[in-house]
Amino acid sequence: MTANVNVLVLPTHMRENDSAAIIIPSTRSAPQKEVSYKHLVAITDSLHRDLAHLGITKACKVAIVLPNGLEFVAVFLSVLRQRAVAAPLDAQLTESEFKDIFSRMKPELVIMLPIPPESSGGPCLPAPAMRAALGLTLRVALCRRTSDVKDGSGLGLQLALDLLEPAHSNHPAVAIVPKASAYSRDDVWSEDGALMLFTSGTTGAPKSVVLSHINLLVAMRIIIANHQLSSMDRTIIITPLHHIIGVCGSLLVTLFSGACAVIPDSLPGAFWQYCTEFGVTWFHAVPTLHRLLLKFPRTKDSMPPRLRFLRSGGSEMAPDLYETLKAFGVPVLEVYGMTETGPAIFCNHLDENGAGARQRSHYPIPDAVDVMILVSSDQPEGETYDKTSLQADQYSNLKMTKEPGVIGEVCVRGKNVMAGYINNSRANTEAFLPNGYFRTGDLGTIQSSGQLKLVGRLKEVINKGGIKIGPSEVEHAALSHESVSEAVCFRIADVMYGEEIGLAVKLRSNSGKNQCTDRDLKQHIRYQLSAFKVPKEIVFVDAVHYNRTGKPLRTQVSQKFAEGLL
């Protein structure tokens, strides 16, 4: 192992950098704040010492329950500086959800904002987390703003441990932990655990993932190179920083390319005005958020002048949305990655003249990532085992290939991939092949051009009489109908074919069911797809539900249909 190489600690030269690192736009109750790199390093150093004072040391798990903002950025960087593992959590979770997560991860410290006085009218977001933490006798530190760090702005941050008693007297008191030594920058190792996250759970129960400094840096360097990020860039972060694409794929790639991140406390209605005002050059959003942003007012119905590209990830972008965004003349880039592999390791890049070189669901394969396609050696092309049913003695029936055009499960290997799920040997056996490749659960193929093309999720692909049908292509065909607002394709049981195609559709608000029947929609889809891919059942719904990264909950819809709940 090598110390002080490839670590997520801001470089020493940043101590003298007066350029803006973070901008927090003004709100009704607070003025705009601009924090330079010099100031950010000073704040991080101060918080780093506070963490040591609180007994946080190497490999300690620190739960960060903070909304998007300066506090999150400074606390996150300081946790990594002290060789601890940062575990950002959604501040909007319920007390029950916090208890479940805290019980599994057993954090040495939980960091949150002070609860505002009732008279302030401010949101009490941390309250459920605080109740859950104290109920489990966990230590809680409140991140308060002070004026201890001064570089002209008078804004500083300092942590204070709030020694509150547990909610019930029959619980033991919160333990007092001795102080720890503050690590120097040279003490931080690239193999140290840096980030703990929980998987989205669309294909099963959420699992705990820890990524090291080097895991994250490999992914970050791919993004920085492919998007040609530099100190001249500015991004506006509207994705949650407790998601990997937010904290690593947006925030860290910005800071470690010397650029500036604009971080509003919530999605602003004047989003496009913010982009123009702050000189935003790029931003990331899931497809559903891109659709929402298109409804926000824009000056002369055009894009902000400094915008270099738009980026999308989390789920596949529908053709109609891509064409709408593309019409504004700004490159639209898609990215693909997982919590387990690091974010956006497969990402569209900008060519030399700045135009986006892309095809929908096609991604260049970076040199740092080895990709193979897993298929069955004794079954038809594209047939692959379900991870959860795979037994060790079945590996002899599988083969890996890079042959162009062969469809199978996408498997990856590289320094970006996690070491394994935490305390979950069964999940690791299912996820990793004996040769070290990680099974993504996504179906895809390597094209003759060398690009990776995604087909769909292994557990969501519909096997209709032995023919594999990706749900996204059916959804895209439905979305091209003028009356359709949202659509989710799902599998249904069928006596003849084993599985058939179901489609749940939400109509546009200005369109009634009388204007679009299931027969109309089937005919529309038939014009675009082969008859074999036309849904057998179409149901009209009031809402289509997505997970927190914008992926439609196809398995959930399938279950509800089977139970007669749609």
From Swiss-Prot:
Which pathway features in its UniProt record?
Mycotoxin biosynthesis
Per the UniProt entry, the disulfide pairs are none
**Region AMP-binding, residue ranges:** 473-551
Alphabetized GO MF terms:
ATP binding; medium-chain fatty acid-CoA ligase activity
Q: Which domain of life is it from?
A: Eukaryota
The UniProt annotation places AMP binding at 196-207
Keywords for this entry?
ATP-binding, Ligase, Nucleotide-binding
EC number(s) per UniProt? 6.2.1.-
- Do the record's keywords include NAD? no
Query: According to its UniProt record, what is one Pfam family this protein matches?
Result: AMP-binding
Name any Gene Ontology BP term.
fatty acid metabolic process
> Which protein family is named in the record?
Belongs to the ATP-dependent AMP-binding enzyme family.
- Please tell me what else the database record remarks about this protein: Gene clusters encoding host-selective toxins (HSTs) are localized on conditionally dispensable chromosomes (CDCs), also called supernumerary chromosomes, where they are present in multiple copies. The CDCs are not essential for saprophytic growth but controls host-selective pathogenicity.
Function in brief: Acyl-CoA synthetase; part of the gene cluster that mediates the biosynthesis of the host-selective toxins (HSTs) AAL-toxins, sphinganine-analog mycotoxins responsible for Alternaria stem canker on tomato by the tomato pathotype. ALT1 also selectively transfers methyl groups at the first and the third cycle of chain elongation for AAL toxin.
Protein name (Swiss-Prot/TrEMBL): Acyl-CoA synthetase ALT10
